[in-house]
């Protein structure tokens, strides 16, 4: 569970990026945070992950031990950045996924167990010895997710996870996200392009100019998106029910 109260963040140049955000994210929830570029989405994610310190307000995080992770010691939260290359530090796929659990100080047998589990879950076992620079965009995104999973977080943050991916890669990453949600992980996804994921989320939160404007079930939120510079999904524009990108 994540409880955010009266959250403010100012950058050194004076930009007031977040203005009094109040938001509660339940355990096991799949939450979509959407907003136009510059709305404050990424700032909020970096505050939740602990990369930034809020100017005012608080973030309280409570997370039980996940039962599907193969080890006990791990951080509560993992974040998959928009630019997957910024998270890749190893020469090969296996080395990169090993980096996190090794830095947690896990014994070698636990590192191997965690890495093998994450590689298997993300479908990377067959290319575990492949140099990272030879990976496709979709493979790099899956590698970034595997690197986070190997540390066993209960809560996973995805910042614009479909950015710069082609259609097959988007579908592949989306499938893995759905699997993680089904396994009980709490997922928080930010994007300005809601089309790809909205059919699968539990709730949608809209951020505009640093303020939380609305939050609720997807079907209630689609009619509010356009007034905040967010393109509604095609199914809503056509008056249809929610349609998954995995259909067809």
Predicted regions and their residues:
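Helix-to-loop junction immediately C-terminal to a conserved catalytic motif
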Residues: 49
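Conserved ABC ATPase signature
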Residues: 131-135, 139
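Catalytic Walker B motif of ABC-type/P-loop ATPase nucleotide-binding domains
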Residues: 156-159
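Conserved ABC ATPase "signature" region
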Residues: 109-127
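ABC ATPase nucleotide-binding domains
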Residues: 223-248
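H-loop/switch region of ABC-family ATPase nucleotide-binding domains
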Residues: 191-192
């Amino acid at each position: 569970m994540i409880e955010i109260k009266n959250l403010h963040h100012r950058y050194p140049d004076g930009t007031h990026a977040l203005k009094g955000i109040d938001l509660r994210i339940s355990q096991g929830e799949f939450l979509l945070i959407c907003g136009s570029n510059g709305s404050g989405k990424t700032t909020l994610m970096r505050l939740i992950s602990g990369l930034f310190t809020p100017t005012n307000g608080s973030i309280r995080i409570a997370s039980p031990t996940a039962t599907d992770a193969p080890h006990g010691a791990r951080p509560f939260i993992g974040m998959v950045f928009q630019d997957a290359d910024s998270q890749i530090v190893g020469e090969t796929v296996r080395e990169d996924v090993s980096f996190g659990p090794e830095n947690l100080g896990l014994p070698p047998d636990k590192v191997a167990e965690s890495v093998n589990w994450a590689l298997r879950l993300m479908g990377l076992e067959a290319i575990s010895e492949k140099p990272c620079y030879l990976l496709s965009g979709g493979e790099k995104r899956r590698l970034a997710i595997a690197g986070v999973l190997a540390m066993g977080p209960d809560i996973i943050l995805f910042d614009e996870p479909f950015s710069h991916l082609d259609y097959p890669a988007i579908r592949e990453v989306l499938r893995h996200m759905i699997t993680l949600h089904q396994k009980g992980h709490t997922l928080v996804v930010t994007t300005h392009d809601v089309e790809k994921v909205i059919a699968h989320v539990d709730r949608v939160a809209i951020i505009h100019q640093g303020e939380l404007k609305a939050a609720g079930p997807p079907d209630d939120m689609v009619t509010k998106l356009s007034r905040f510079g967010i393109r509604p999904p095609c199914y809503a524009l056509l008056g249809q029910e929610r349609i998954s990108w995995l259909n067809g």
